[in-house]
């Protein structure tokens, strides 16, 4: 039940995002600046629509607004049902203790992962979530002038390409929130930036940490402990 409710909620959220992007793209196609969220608000729509000079395009914008209203109306009950069903799974209460995970992400994590025992290690979860590093290596040793020598370190090609997109989005969003929300994760984020590490790499490390701690808390059924930040190195 939880898995299907999660799918329904995620589908609505994705459709809502697409409609919002299409709406802004329509305004931009007429060179109408539309930064921020003001363009979506009901109270300002008539003003925005008046900026479109062509009747056909203006009508298309009205239809996009209708889609936006419908999807926003559907999202709230879908969210409520997802949260209500997630309370039937006791682990969600423990996962909510993890900073930046929250009720919705905890519910989605349980729905998407199903059981933590499908992953023997955090690295398997990283790979499944699109947070694993792919390397390139043709062999550990090679011949140089007839002598066997150890090769140089393998090349890192980037993150793995075959993964669960919803789960990756969940952990990346949690990492983004953790980087701006006061707490232990933000402290780690600021310390890493002070060392000269790029923000994108620090957020990736945060996403991996959050995924690893999620797996540990779920497998052991224990409460979140801030000390896990020290032991769950990414």
Per-range role (PLM):
Residues 19-20, 76-78, 114-118, 177-184, ...:
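Short helix-capping/linker segments at secondary-structure and domain boundaries
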Residues 136, 140, 144, 188-234:
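Low-complexity, acidic/Ser/Thr- and charged residue-rich accessory regions of DNA metabolism proteins
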Residues 23-28, 36-40, 82, 138-141, ...:
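Short coil/turn segments at secondary-structure boundaries
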Residues 41-44, 97, 101, 163, ...:
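Short, conserved alpha-helical segments within structured domains
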């Amino acid at each position: 039940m939880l898995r299907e409710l999660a799918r329904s909620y995620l589908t609505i959220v994705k459709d809502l995002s697409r409609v919002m992007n299409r709406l802004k793209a329509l305004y931009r196609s007429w060179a109408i600046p539309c930064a921020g969220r003001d363009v979506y608000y009901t109270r300002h729509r008539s003003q925005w629509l008046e900026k479109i000079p062509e009747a056909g395009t203006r009508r298309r914008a009205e239809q996009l607004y209708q889609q936006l209203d419908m999807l926003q109306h559907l999202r709230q009950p879908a969210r409520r049902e997802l949260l209500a069903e997630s309370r039937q799974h006791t682990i969600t209460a423990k996962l909510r203790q993890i900073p930046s995970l929250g009720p919705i992400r905890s519910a989605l994590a349980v729905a998407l992962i199903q059981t933590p025992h499908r992953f023997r290690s955090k690295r398997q979860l990283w790979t499944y979530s699109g947070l694993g590093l792919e390397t390139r290596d043709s062999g550990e040793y090679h011949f140089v002038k007839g002598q066997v020598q150890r090769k140089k370190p393998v090349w890192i090609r980037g993150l793995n390409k075959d993964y669960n997109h919803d789960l990756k989005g969940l952990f990346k969003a949690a990492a983004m929130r953790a980087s701006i929300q006061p707490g232990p994760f933000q402290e780690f984020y600021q310390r890493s930036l002070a060392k000269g590490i790029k923000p994108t790499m620090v957020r990736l490390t945060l996403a991996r940490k959050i995924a690893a701690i999620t797996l540990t808390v779920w497998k052991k059924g224990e409460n979140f402990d801030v000390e896990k930040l020290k032991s769950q190195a990414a």
